[in-house]
């Protein structure tokens, strides 16, 4: 599933292609996604101008020149947004086609259909946005804040930093990498982390996310940026997906670990 850097990459790629463009038509080709597509609600976008594209956690928000409605998008497991010439042949899993006034169209493509593409009332937060935690790249997201969340919590630290109600946008890839670079076992109870360890972990999270955004996100099987190019941060990954290989720090063998039904990778020697 795309994590924060992938969604941020998508946002940055879409902005110059969509902002100030007018929507001339909306074609809903398959109504069944995570939540059914509402063709009538989406038709309200016709004749509207796209004014801005923002991100909250792993969600994209497409704002238009109406104050009452906006579009909320989640890419799910395999979703992508592409801006293509209107003459480009329509693909099987192009579920929504938004025609623009410049000869191009925005297409939502999602083979697994776990994504979300919905119109919502912009004057109040969508229910999926109401209880989200702090953005990890905000200045207010510090090691001290993380340490406060760890207090008296027996939950594994790997699960805590992926809890979207605490810190948003961090998935298994960046959690695995940040814990390795911080020397912290992913299965340690959060309450056992010191303030210094939390500071180190948060610093690594920020560094990893910033670097991944700069490089266009992590190459996942189903992720690509709006221009169709895959991200290439995977070349920089240290341990994620490398169980059974040698640790890049100490040379010992990296091991798998199952936490809350999610697989992670760590070095038993380097991570304590």
From Swiss-Prot:
Oligomer and partners: Monomer.
GO molecular function annotation: 8-oxo-7,8-dihydroguanine DNA N-glycosylase activity; class I DNA-(apurinic or apyrimidinic site) endonuclease activity; damaged DNA binding; zinc ion binding
Record-given protein name: Formamidopyrimidine-DNA glycosylase
Taxonomy of the source species: Bacteria, Pseudomonadati, Pseudomonadota, Gammaproteobacteria, Cardiobacteriales
Residue intervals of every FPG-type zinc finger in the record: 238-272
Catalytic activity: Hydrolysis of DNA containing ring-opened 7-methylguanine residues, releasing 2,6-diamino-4-hydroxy-5-(N-methyl)formamidopyrimidine; 2'-deoxyribonucleotide-(2'-deoxyribose 5'-phosphate)-2'-deoxyribonucleotide-DNA = a 3'-end 2'-deoxyribonucleotide-(2,3-dehydro-2,3-deoxyribose 5'-phosphate)-DNA + a 5'-end 5'-phospho-2'-deoxyribonucleoside-DNA + H(+)
Annotated binding of DNA, by residue: 93, 112, 153
Cofactor note: Binds 1 zinc ion per subunit.
PANTHER family recorded: FORMAMIDOPYRIMIDINE-DNA GLYCOSYLASE
Xref: InterPro entries: DNA_glyclase/AP_lyase_DNA-bd (IPR015886), DNA_glyclase_Znf_dom_DNA_BS (IPR015887), Formamido-pyr_DNA_Glyclase (IPR020629), FPG_cat (IPR012319), MutM-like_N-ter (IPR035937), Ribosomal_uS13-like_H2TH (IPR010979), Znf_DNA_glyclase/AP_lyase (IPR000214), Znf_FPG/IleRS (IPR010663)
Organism this protein belongs to: Dichelobacter nodosus (strain VCS1703A)
Function recorded in the entry: Involved in base excision repair of DNA damaged by oxidation or by mutagenic agents. Acts as a DNA glycosylase that recognizes and removes damaged bases. Has a preference for oxidized purines, such as 7,8-dihydro-8-oxoguanine (8-oxoG). Has AP (apurinic/apyrimidinic) lyase activity and introduces nicks in the DNA strand. Cleaves the DNA backbone by beta-delta elimination to generate a single-strand break at the site of the removed base with both 3'- and 5'-phosphates.
Top-level taxonomic group: Bacteria
Keyword check for Lyase: yes
